[in-house]
Structures are given as C-alpha cells and as structure tokens.
C-alpha cells in the first residue's frame, strides 16, 4: 500500500499510521476482526472491533477512489486534453462524485444536439455568439447545411453547443452545488391524501427546511412519502442570485447568451445538483439509520438471559387459538398445546383454556410465561394475568415477537422441529428469546427483528453487512458454548463458516460432548487457521482444563501455566484470586513474555471463569397484573423497558399494549443531541406519564420528574 493511503487513513480516523498498517497486515494474513480486537491488542494499540472495521472499510473506499482516478486520468490523457491543473484537481478530489464532475466534459457521450452541431461545423458560430458579433445572421447563413438548413436552425445548433459546454463547466457546477447546500430550502407539498389514510405523512403536507439542516429521519420520511405518491418534494432556490452569478461569466450579452444561461441553469445544472444533493442526503441518512439500527441490535442481543427457568411460550391469536410451548431450563422443548383463551371462542372454550393453562403451570412448575406482542396480545395478557392470580410464584413478560414468524417458517426451524406447525415453532422461539435472546435471535435475519428506523428504505446490502458485523461482534464478545450452540450461532464465531459449524454439530451428535478445546481440532475441515481464529471464543463449561471455559486463547496456555507455578496456584479459589489481583501487570507481563493488555484480559477471565458479560445488562421486567391505558394518569410514575430508539426519541414498554414514546425533548432538563446518548434498547427506565390519548391509543412519557421539571 502507498504511504499516502496509510497517512490518509490515520489522519481521517485519528489513529497512528502504525496502527492502520498493522490492522491491514493482520487482515491480509486472514485474521478476523473479533480475533484481532481480542487477541492482538498489543499490535493494534488496543483498537476495538468498530475501529478495526472502520480501517478496513475506509481502505476499500480509498482504493475504489484511487482506481477511479487512475482510470479517468488515463482516459483524459488519451484524448490529449490532460492539463497539469486538471490532473492536480482530479488527484486532490476526496469524493467519487467530485472525480465524476471533473471528468464530465471529457466523458464519452451518446450523440446529443451539441454533438450534431459540432459535427456540422457550428463551433465557430458559437464563438461568435460569445463575442456578441453584429454579423451573426450572415455568419449563420454561411454555415447552413442539410442538417441545419436555415440560419435560425444554425444559430439554435450553436446555442446547443454553448449550453452543453456551459452546463459541464466544473466551476459553475461546484458553485451551484455549494449554493444549494448552504442556502436553499427543501420543501414538500401534498400530492394525494387518499394514499395516506392514517395521515402518517401529515407533517410533510406543507413542509420546508434548510437543506444543510435537514435531519436524517426527515430525509428518509420525505423519500418514502414521495415514493408512495403522497407528497411532492422539491427545492426552493434564490434563482435571482444564481442568475447574477452565471451572467457575470459573460462579458457580452445578447438573447442567445440569455438562453444559454437559463437553459444551463434551470434545465441542466440545478437538476443535476439537486439529484446529487438528494443522493448525498439519502446516503448520510441511511448511514445514520443503519448506525442506529446496529446500536439497537447490539443492545437487544446483549439483554441479560433468564437462565435456569422453566418457561412457557405463548403465541397469541384470535380465531386459530393461542399456541403454547413449554421449554425446560436448557431451552429443550417439553410439550406444545393449543388453547382458545379469547373471543370469538365460546365461554366454555375460554373456561377450558384457563384450566389447561393452570394444569401446565402446575405440571411443569412454570416460572415465567413469555407472551408474544402481536395479534391478540392485549387480550391474551389479560387472560394470563387472571390465571396467575392463583399462582403467585409465576410471572409473565411481554416479548417482542418481531421475526418469530420469519424464523418459524424457515428451513432452520423446519430442521429443528420437523413435526410441528409454524405457529408452535413460533411459540418455542418466543420462550427461548427470554431464556437466551442472543442464541435465539441469531437464527433470524437481523432486518426482521424490528429495532430500526426506516430499515426497509435504506441500502439493504449495506444494512445487512453492518448488522452481520454487529451479530458477529456480540457473539464473539459473549463467547459460545461449543456443546450446546446451534450451527447458526456457531457460524458467527470467528473463523467458522456454515460448513464447519454444521460439522461441529454433527461431530457432537456422533461422539458426544466435546471435552476440550484441543478436541475441536478433530472436527472435519476445521484446520489450523480456523482453530486459531475460533478457539478463544468457544467455551467448554465442564472441561478438565478450566481455561477452556474462559476467553484465554490456547496460545497463552503455556504462559498461564508458568503464572500458576510462579504463584503456586492449583485451583482458582479465593486465595488464588487474591494473588492474581495483587500482581504487578507490567513486571509479570515481561516475565511471561506477554503484552500487558493480554495479561490484563487473562486475569479478568481467571477471576470470573465462565463469566457472561450479558449478566451486567438489564433483565426483562416481570409482571403479574395487567395494566391498561385507561388506568394511567398524567404524572404517574412507572418502570419500563426501552424497546426501540429512534432519532426523535425512544419507545418504552410499561406494560400496556402500546409502547409509550419519550420524545427527545422529554429525556432531560438539559439539551440532548441524540436519544442514544441517554437510553439504549433493553434499558430499564423510570418514567412519568405526560399524555394519554385514549381515542388514538397513544401514550407519551417523560424521563423528567414533573415535580423537578421547572
């Protein structure tokens, strides 16, 4: 790689050149992002996964930009038109769009009016127009031809030449771009209200904002409303100012020049710059939406698992009945059943449903009922709460079932439960989401999980890449039990792919539990490189070697053995842990031939072997009584769980059917730049009711105590 690229990367990302170079070298050697972040900290200067990904992504972008520059320079040079000034401008361009703007006048075009006019020899006439020649008519008559048989048509052809040249002038286009970006407004007006029955886009029926200040979520809303045909989006410019600037380029003036200015400005340059700015606004908005979705997804995947609980999954429905699934403490399916707990079922069927649910609770000692939040959720919650009056030891939780139906109809679900209906598989998924959200949610396309903002309006390729990165990062940070993980979960482990993951599951089924990390090497097609990349992230809870249930990499086992001998440690009891805490990191690292960061991580793992970082995050709120919107009053204090974070606020589940909105203005008494600075998906928060709209079934909440708001 050229030094210029490394320096640009380092400068743009605020890193040392050596860090950038090291990351790119490690990546070229086949190391994964999770592996580099966790086990090569000394080499990278302790960069995390996001920083490493940023280096890799920006390197690709810079390479693409550089390749395009070289192609453009070669093509212009082949035409004999490459000046030193143009070459310097292309080489200095920081965006692909700027390179294309500079290349525009030299780009091969389909035959245009201007092309035909030039071929007919009308260029000298165009020059005479610029000079405001008094003999235009006579000169035009000299240049008439079969294609341009009259002087009027010849003059029109000459004007076409000037319009094309003028509209491709880079300095004019650049000035216009900056003028629109800094000083123009973007507006929207109602086009067809019949396409917006719920008035979702009402705010955009008559909307205006500065282009430079337009927020990302508004950009995406305008795009969607325009695409649906509800609104018309346009720009409002200072055309008089633009016209003055364009006119100043001409020393002479005449009607033909005026036409060149108007045609170039209104028909060529402004539309082109509007398209570019809309595209850039959309790209920035998409990046923001994807970043927010990624952040929400990470927090959702890190929700604390409810381990060791007997759970009943409850997939609500009206006509077809609720599907129930009982899973044991390990997530293994025990039984399924269908009951009819809500209308239109008869009273006799509802009474039978109560008895059936009560029998299941008693028979299997159900501790928690996980109710899906879809159709008939509110009625099902009331039904469950009524039954639980006789079972004070049992609670219920409303679980976000987004994507459960996608999973239940998937090939993976059919393979897991070939004899069950789609609905029963969905109930199992709902129950397991409570027990181990990460293990269950990795089975679902992240886009279907429903914690985003306009996720269907953004680049699906870019969204998938970023969400996959989040899933991979979280899975490896948490670690995976190699003996219980599904092949889907294993496939997200560093160094493993679909085939190797399936081979691990097949190996377990054939040989029983894997007893040690060393045994993992026996799995077919799991070679030395895959083992190196994966081993530290795979856990074996009951292994003879306690290190096999930690994040300590096998490459560090000899050093840990030396450490144990040095400290006379034979077991990780309290005495051993005190010795580890008292270590001088710098001296010990040097003695063991380890980096300080690596030793620090090793000690953290030894102090808490088998630790699950998700245990530090919030667990779901357990309930026994149902709460309805009509029960709420303004100023009432409640506890809730953050379900989704968007640019304008956050949605919180407080136990009523509809999630309440905390607008960004209600998040703090001081200014909040973005909701994600205050709350995250999965957070438990104390809120106060600020508005209850029974008619539209909407709820507004606040994080600010009304008694302290002034």
Residue ranges and their predicted role:
Residues 16-17, 29-30, 96, 122, ...:
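Short flexible coil/turn linkers enriched for glycine and charged/polar residues
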Residues 32, 44, 48-149, 477-616, ...:
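Accessory alpha-helical DNA-binding modules that contact the DNA backbone or grooves
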Residues 51-53, 65-75, 79-313, 317-419, ...:
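Duplex nucleic acid-engaging cores and interfaces of nucleic-acid transaction enzymes
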Residues 98, 397, 403, 408-478, ...:
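Long, charge-rich intrinsically disordered scaffolds of nucleic-acid metabolism proteins
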Residues 139-141, 147-151, 207-210, 229, ...:
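Low-complexity, acidic/Ser/Thr- and charged residue-rich accessory regions of DNA metabolism proteins
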Residues 178-186, 314-318, 375-379, 399-406, ...:
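A glycine-rich phosphate-binding loop feature that marks nucleotide/adenosyl-phosphate handling sites
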Residues 276-294, 448-479, 587-634:
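Long, charged amphipathic helices and adjacent flexible linkers at domain junctions
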């Amino acid at each position: 790689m050229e030094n210029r690229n490394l320096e640009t990367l380092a400068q743009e990302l605020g890193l040392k050149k050596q860090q950038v170079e090291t990351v790119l070298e490690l990546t070229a050697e086949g190391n994964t992002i999770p592996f580099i972040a966790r086990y090569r900290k000394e080499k990278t200067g302790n960069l995390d996964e996001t920083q490493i990904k940023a280096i890799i992504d920006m390197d690709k972008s810079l390479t693409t930009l550089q390749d395009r520059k070289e192609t453009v320079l070669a093509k212009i040079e082949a035409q004999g038109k490459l000046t030193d000034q143009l070459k310097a401008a292309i080489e200095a361009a920081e965006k692909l769009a700027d390179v294309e703007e500079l290349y525009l006048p030299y780009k091969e075009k389909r035959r245009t009016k201007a092309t035909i006019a030039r071929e007919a020899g009308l260029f000298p006439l165009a020059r005479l127009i610029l000079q405001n020649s008094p003999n235009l008519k006579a000169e035009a008559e000299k240049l008439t031809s079969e294609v341009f048989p009259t002087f009027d048509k010849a003059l029109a052809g000459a004007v076409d030449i000037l319009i094309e040249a003028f509209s491709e002038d880079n300095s004019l286009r650049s000035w216009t771009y900056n003028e629109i970006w800094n000083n123009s407004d973007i507006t929207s007006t109602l086009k067809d209200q019949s396409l917006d029955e719920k008035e979702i886009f009402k705010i955009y029926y008559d909307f205006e904002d500065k282009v430079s200040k337009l927020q990302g979520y508004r950009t995406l809303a305008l795009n969607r409303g325009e695409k649906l045909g509800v609104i018309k989006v346009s720009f409002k410019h200072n055309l008089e100012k633009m016209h003055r600037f364009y006119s100043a380029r001409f020393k002479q003036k005449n009607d033909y020049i005026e036409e060149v200015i108007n045609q170039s400005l209104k028909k060529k340059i402004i539309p082109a710059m509007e398209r570019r700015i809309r595209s850039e606004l959309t790209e920035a908005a998409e990046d923001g939406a994807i970043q927010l979705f990624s952040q929400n997804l990470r927090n959702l995947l890190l929700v604390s698992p409810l381990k060791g609980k007997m759970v009943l999954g409850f997939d609500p429905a009206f006509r077809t009945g609720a599907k129930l699934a009982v899973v044991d403490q390990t997530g293994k399916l025990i039984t399924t059943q269908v009951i009819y707990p809500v209308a239109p079922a008869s009273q006799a069927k509802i009474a039978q449903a109560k008895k059936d649910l009560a029998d299941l609770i008693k028979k299997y000692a159900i501790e928690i009922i996980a109710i899906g939040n879809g159709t008939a959720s509110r009625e099902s919650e009331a039904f469950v709460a009524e039954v639980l009056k006789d079972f004070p030891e049992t609670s219920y939780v409303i679980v976000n079932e987004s994507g459960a139906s996608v999973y239940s109809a998937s090939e993976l679900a059919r393979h897991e439960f070939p004899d069950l209906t789609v609905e029963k598989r969905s109930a199992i998924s709902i129950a397991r989401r409570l027990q181990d959200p990460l293990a269950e949610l990795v089975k679902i396309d992240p886009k279907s999980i429903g914690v985003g903002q306009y996720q269907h309006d953004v680049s699906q390729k870019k969204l998938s890449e970023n969400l996959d990165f989040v899933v991979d990062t979280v899975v490896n940070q948490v670690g995976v039990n190699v003996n219980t993980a599904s092949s889907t979960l294993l496939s997200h482990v560093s160094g493993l792919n679909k085939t190797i993951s399936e081979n691990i599951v097949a190996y377990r089924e054939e040989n029983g539990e894997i007893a040690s990390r060393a045994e993992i090497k026996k799995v077919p097609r799991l070679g030395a490189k895959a083992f190196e990349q994966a081993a530290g992230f795979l856990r074996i809870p009951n292994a003879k070697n306690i290190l096999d249930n930690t994040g300590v990499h096998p490459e560090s086992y000899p050093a840990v053995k030396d450490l144990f001998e040095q400290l006379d440690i034979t077991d990780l009891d309290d005495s051993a842990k005190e010795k580890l805490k008292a270590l001088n990191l710098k001296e010990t690292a040097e003695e063991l031939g380890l980096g300080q960061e690596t030793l620090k991580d090793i000690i953290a793992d030894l102090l808490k072997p088998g630790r699950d970082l998700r245990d530090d995050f919030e667990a779901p709120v357990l309930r026994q009584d149902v709460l309805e919107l009509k029960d709420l009053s303004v100023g009432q204090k409640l506890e809730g769980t953050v379900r989704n974070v968007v640019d304008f606020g956050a949605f919180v589940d407080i136990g009523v059917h509809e999630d309440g909105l905390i607008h960004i203005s209600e998040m703090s008494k001081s200014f909040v730049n973005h909701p994600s600075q205050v709350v995250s998906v999965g957070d438990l928060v104390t809120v106060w009711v600020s508005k209850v709209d029974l008619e539209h079934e909407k709820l507004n909440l606040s994080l600010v105590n009304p008694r302290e708001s002034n």
